Amino acid sequence: GKGPDILILDGISSETYAEQGMLEDLSGILKEAGLLDNIESAYTKEDGSIYEMPVKFGIPMIEGNKEDVQAVTDLASLADVLTKHKDEYGLTSENIYKLPLLYSMYPQALLEKLADNNSAAWMKENGTLDEKKIKEFLEQSERIYQAGKDAMDELKAAYPQAFDDSEQPVYERAGSISGETAVLLSRNCEFALGDIFSPLDFAFVNSMAEIDTSLAYALWNGQMANCFIPVSRIGISSRASQKAAAEKFVEYLFSEEGQMLSREDGFPVVESVYNGEDYWNQGEAGNVLVTGGSSNSENGQELVYSIKVPSADKVNELKQLGKMLTTPVLDNTIITSAVCENGVRYLNGDISLDEAANAVMQQVNLYLAE
């Protein structure tokens, strides 16, 4: 059978493909592209070969109260801070509530959300799973879930129809943090956590901290620091029937024109585009891009907010931050689903921490041994 010439490897580990010689070495094509050093080296093997490259990337962000954001340096300290505020969660008045995180009520979505930015720590150098790190992930996620558990039980009792199990939200990585930032103005959550993929996403994050100066944002580091989110990891099949055409297409994706096709789905990996003005240009600093409203939980008043173009200084700070990110998150659905499935059973109290970690190890090692 003939497979496709160009492979989109999102959610799939390319290691096996590369080891079996199924992927073309892209280093020749990409040498000309002038990629950002930090992204390129993350995918360059010891012998200089490159079997896959993301077309764009995202930056993990955390936003919330300034002191709290500064206190979060990894997953355990995130759990510490959320636990510290335990007494504030729940119904603060008849129709106003506060939770640790937006996904706090839904074990599956919460774990998937947290997995995103911790998963890079789960693999050992030798390509096997690190049980200690998996255990730490499950343990800290459980603390985060427990921090909001009483509040959720209170909400469920007050609004049973809102918590119908069939209505579970589905976590979408590409959803970006921008939609979550408004809950900070209304004080419904302790933190907004997620990723930014565009100048507009960054405008949301930055504007919230300008509207409410008690808020701040920072790179969100989990069990592993300085991670980025790869978007559309591309490879060329070594059995490609139209190899020249496939190479031309990949060259185009990593050209200035190809990188500028869309500005919504990730930051450019080509240095000249990333460093340039065009990609980031949203008009004059301070111009209003979007307006929105959310009801303020403290006094019930409607809050109207404007998302404005960030200053050049703020954009430059973000650009510098993007160049410091060295490790892609583990983009492997088989591993993350094993962790999240067993994690849900642990969060729900059906199995112990050790049982959950063992189940993950067994499931994943079977898969890795294939």
Regions found by a protein language model. Give the residues of each.
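Hinge/lid segment of periplasmic solute-binding proteins
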Residues: L9-M61, A76-S77, D212-L219
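C-terminal capping/gating helix-and-loop segments adjacent to ligand/active sites or protein-protein/ligand interfaces
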Residues: V290-L368
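A ligand-binding cleft/hinge motif common to bilobed small-molecule-binding domains
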Residues: I12-A18, G194-D212
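Extracytoplasmic/periplasmic solute-binding protein
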Residues: Y51-V55, P60, A79-E142, Q146, ...
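Short glycine- and hydrophobic/aromatic-rich loop-to-beta-strand nucleating segment
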Residues: P60-G64, I234-G235
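Extracytoplasmic/periplasmic substrate-recognition and gating elements
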Residues: V205-D278
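Glycine-centered hinge/linker elements that transmit conformational signals in sensory
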Residues: K124-I177, N206, T213-A218
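Early extracytoplasmic/lumenal segment of secretory-pathway proteins
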Residues: G1-S14, F163-E167, Y171-G179
